[in-house]
From Swiss-Prot:
The chain crosses the membrane at residues 112-132, 142-162, 169-189, 232-252, 257-277, 335-355, 422-442. HMG-CoA reductase; part of the first module of ergosterol biosynthesis pathway that includes the early steps of the pathway, conserved across all eukaryotes, and which results in the formation of mevalonate from acetyl-coenzyme A (acetyl-CoA). In this module, the cytosolic acetyl-CoA acetyltransferase catalyzes the formation of acetoacetyl-CoA. The hydroxymethylglutaryl-CoA synthase then condenses acetyl-CoA with acetoacetyl-CoA to form HMG-CoA. The rate-limiting step of the early module is the reduction to mevalonate by the 3-hydroxy-3-methylglutaryl-coenzyme A (HMG-CoA) reductase. The keyword Transmembrane helix applies. This is 3-hydroxy-3-methylglutaryl-coenzyme A reductase. GO terms for biological process: coenzyme A metabolic process; ergosterol biosynthetic process; isoprenoid biosynthetic process. It is an enzyme of class 1 (oxidoreductase). It comes from Cyberlindnera jadinii (Torula yeast). The keyword Transmembrane helix applies.
Amino acid sequence: MFYHGASANQHWIAVDDLSKVPVDVDHYNVVPFQFRRAGEYKEPVLSGIVELDEVKFVVSQSDAAEQWQQLTAEDGTVWRSRAYHGKLGKYSDMAVGAFNKVLNLVRGAETFDIALVTCAYIAMFYTLFNLFARMRAVGSKVWLGLSTLVSSFFAFLFALYITTRVLDLSIPFLSLSEGIPFFVAVVGFNNKILLAEKVLQNQLNAQSSKNDAPTVLYQALREQGPLLLRDHLFMITAFLGCSFYASYLDGLKNFCILAALILAFDILTTSTFLSAILSLKLEINQIHRSTLLREQLEDDGLTETTVDDVLKSNSLAGTKTFTDAPSTLVTVAKVAGVSVFFGLHFYGFGSAWLSDLSAGNETNDTFTLYDAVADQIPIGSNGTLVTLFPTRFFLPEKLSTQIEAVVLSFIGLISTAARDKYISKFILFAFAVSASINVYLLNVARIHTTRLEDAIELKKPKKKASKTAVSVPKAVVVKDSETTKSSEILHSSSESESEQSSRPLEQVIELYKDGKVKTLVDDEVVSLVTAGKLPLYALEKQLGDNLRAVAIRRKAISDLADAPVLRSNKLPYLHYDYDRVFGACCENVIGYMPLPVGVAGPLIIDGKPYHIPMATTEGCLVASAMRGCKAINLGGGVTTVLTKDGMTRGPCVKFPSLKRAGQCKLWLDSDEGQEEMKKAFNSTSRFARLQHLQTALAGDLLFIRFRTVTGDAMGMNMISKGVEYALKQMTEVFGWDDMMVVSVSGNYCTDKKPAAVNWINGRGKSVVAEASIPKDAVVKVLKSSVKAVVDVNVNKNLIGSAMAGSVGGFNAQAANMVTAVYLALGQDPAQNVESSNCITLMTETEDGDLKVSVSMPSIEVGTIGGGTILDPQGSMLELLGVRGPADVPGENARQLAKIVASIVLSGELSLVSALAAGHLVQSHMQHNRAAAKK
């Protein structure tokens, strides 16, 4: 408010306290207003106004001006008053104006220029489309592509600021609209895409080296960073050279400088912002894999403790790099960066009270307004008081302003609600919770790993005191000959145990009944076992220490079976992770059986070389496979085709009559029955999916063969759970309440037995592998001829097997290869029975080369669960690159089946060639009859 005294010599002064102003002064209201977004609309004609530039002033003694909400122009346009904070209409007007400007430029441009710019825009949009398409192929639908664009946009903003503000160069919008499409099309995003591909590929490969996300990212930057730096520096040099060469063309020179700065800042944003996004993507992938592995292992029937132990081993624990060690330089850099960031924001926040520039501007504006309207305000006899209202804006009533009004009304409602004393506190609390959750998610991989390790440590037993611990003697250097003596005792009683006299058996039994088995010494626990008071199988549970349980069981069985060999080191048991064995792989454990492991290869399978591990005690088996691999590689390697994937389980059910059994068979064979059973079965697992039901009737017995995909697990436990539930639904929901389940497995599967149903319909993975061997390789490597090899294969593998009435045994030694690979890779060795079903075909091509193929309809393998959770077997799966679950469920198991078929092919080729050349006996005498050492 402003006051002017009655004298003409006085001036207008600002008034804060009305008590200093006479009561009977004349009072006027000054209301400034503007008409915005007029466009083609006419403004209302008003009388008694003062106009200054775009601002109009209404001077009135009444409050009518304050009540103005709506004005009508001569053309009927309705203008509504509002605070000019909404900008939807403004942006729409800007868009329309920009479109009109572009349209005018197009009309005035030459045809060639229009075509050139159009091609540039097409190339730019294609580059953007290619960015998202390639990122999608990498494994990100939207976010990595969007993050790449944001990274480049930040580089553009930084470069634009430096160019226009620091270098004071003019970059017209027209130059940007014409130059940016060419720039994007030429530079592209190839280096960033390659970086993302390298990062995600390194993570897949890192499962063998267990690197964490920072290490994986660091390795990718080391590999891809120099290429990014080389390309960007080359283009920066080119743009700067162009700016010097075309210095007389200001527009081109300025844009070239801008482009060079964009590339320079792009290096910075790629190595900071985009790298951070990639690191987050890595950790999210790690969490996804851990969750997927946990669910598959639990579906496969493993205990929670075993699952946690496997997850700990398979987590990206991380190898040491410079990022792991505490670095003073890195810490100082981080603190300095954060300090500068907050300092700049604090300075910006405090600039108003540091310089007070805004106050000066406001004062100048106020007196400018006073000078413009002072002549229109009469001075009263007792002075005049003027109230200056905020500027009021009038906008034409059109669609954009109506939408804007609705949006502003909604925002205003939210703003009012947010200021409520209760709602504001709730929002603050929700913000705190949200921030905490986001911090948790950003560190979720490390938190996940840490908590997993802590949980495993809690579940593992505490270390015992010296008197109850497994006694391990100090290492003693002995001669090689001494290590084979049966009298060598690996574990003798500890000093504390020997010094302490054993308590009477009755006292030991009382301590056992009181639950104090852990406090007993080893010999006392052995006495409980030999007395029949403590079962052998309960040692792990009672002692809470798996390793100690194994040691005591060895001593107990040594006494019970009078087998002192168990007190020697002939059957080792130390240095083994029994936590994975207990509840998953074996019971009543007394040690582990070392097997020699050889490697055959490299064998090229579908264009990729593999070194295939084989655990065997048969001499010349690995050598035979190696010879086959060499011959196959000379022909270009193995080509494989997977024709079917489905594990089976065949329960047997019984009905009161043949009629009811037949009705159930018809229902199961119908589309309705298949669909109902699929719904019931699929509800039991995320991974098991029922493919088909096959039925067979024998009297009133009905055999149902469930064929199911089971992801990367071999799937017997997973599918059994689904079968039990589906049969339960049949009796309780589907109307077959008179059905009785005879057995969940009715041998119609068929598991671990030779059966025509597996040979005909397949079980597990059905794979066909083929290779073409040059005739020169047959002669030089296999030491035979194509004709002789083909002849032996027909007479032996086909006619000979037919004469024997074989089912699926039309091969030379498929079981040899399958079993050796299964033992090395943690597969079920008993399933070599059906997995070894194979027919080997060999023919001579028109060129005289040898074509070999093996067809194996029932390879039963998995890359999670079972023996694959053990570290030695798991490490061999890592050697093949198929350990654990794949990103595409089931892909690792399918690839493993192809590897098995391929090594069988090499073994078949080598053995048949040896038979054709008459070398079989000679090779076995050389490799399998080595003289025993004395």
